[in-house]
């Protein structure tokens, strides 16, 4: 599945913001708007035993240009909340359920 970082109208959002994947399915986050974005999984909002640092971008790393991507594969079933570190305060948060 491809998830856009930033809506077509420049909104600070993940599109889609709430989605499901199968365990082992690749998720590609793609910068859509040209604002600097990243993908950080919330260590308190992921399945127990999953290391957030192994699936997240560093909070300092950014996808700066349109078309830049970050891919991750989640193998542990459950619900994962993620956010864009620079824009978390603006509500740029998403959720993926791994089945």
From Swiss-Prot:
Keyword terms, alphabetized: Chloroplast, Copper, Electron transport, Membrane, Metal-binding, Plastid, Thylakoid, Transport
Swiss-Prot/TrEMBL cofactor(s): Cu(2+)
Keyword field contains Thylakoid: yes
UniProt-recorded Gene Ontology molecular function terms: copper ion binding; electron transfer activity
Keyword Cytoplasm found: no
Function: Participates in electron transfer between P700 and the cytochrome b6-f complex in photosystem I.
Protein name (Swiss-Prot/TrEMBL): Plastocyanin B'/B''
Native source organism of the sequence: Nicotiana tabacum (Common tobacco)
């Amino acid at each position: 599945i491809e998830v856009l970082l930033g809506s077509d109208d420049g909104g600070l959002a993940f599109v889609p913001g709430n989605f499901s994947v199968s365990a082992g399915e690749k998720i590609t986050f793609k910068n859509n708007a040209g604002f600097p974005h990243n993908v950080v999984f919330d260590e308190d909002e992921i399945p127990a035993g999953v290391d957030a640092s192994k699936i997240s971008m560093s909070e300092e790393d950014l996808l700066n240009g349109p078309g830049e991507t970050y891919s991750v594969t989640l193998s542990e079933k459950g619900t994962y909340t993620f956010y864009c570190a620079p824009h978390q305060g603006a509500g740029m948060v998403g959720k993926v359920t791994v089945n």
